[in-house]
Amino acid sequence: MSRVVLVTGGARGIGLACARAFVGAGDRVAVTYRSAPPSGTDAADLFCVSCDVTDAGQVDAAFDAVEAELGPVEVLVANAGITADMLVLRMDDAAFATVVDTNLAGGFRTAKRAVQKMMRARWGRIIFISSVVGATGQAGQANYAASKAGLVGLSRSLAREFASRNITVNVVAPGPITTEMTASLSEDRRTAITEAVPLGRFGTPEEVAETVRFLASDAAAFITGAVVPVDGGLGMGPS
């Protein structure tokens, strides 16, 4: 059955891979972007909407546009996120708050808007994209790790709150994934991360996307409140 899917932060990386996976499955897919929409073949069959998830008004407007074009959102992939890495002693309140406002509060805003129509339909899927560092922590990423850890508490609270309406809420926690965000890593840092991953490599956006697509499917109807790692075993910690 074709569903209406909205992927926030869907212009590149994991978000775009999720959007393309849903399009490939025959779904009607919208993506939000903050700076530039996907282009060329990446944008094929996607409805693209500008949206800053830190602005509740823009979130409402994006959902209104998607609903007018495709219909009510049935699957939400809350992926929009940013980083602002630095050591805590150099991190001011704004650097902490901006990341949390985007990654955590942005997820709250989009999920709150999505469940309004999902409740009426008595069906819905919400998948938050977190990170392995939400569980393990990472030096220089206190803001990012806190925001990603917060998504777990948010998702499990929503999972309990809306279970009676047949709305499932889950988290996917990627490890190191080959994206534009990781492309800037130095070769030494990249090697160190690879050596820490039991499977010995970075993952791909498509591997994350397939996990997300499964959680949105009828096959995952009895899964809610879960945190699914796609991290090559990194989250297990050192052996």
Residue spans for each PLM region:
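Alpha-helical segment proximal to the catalytic Tyr-Lys
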Residues: 116, 160-164, 221
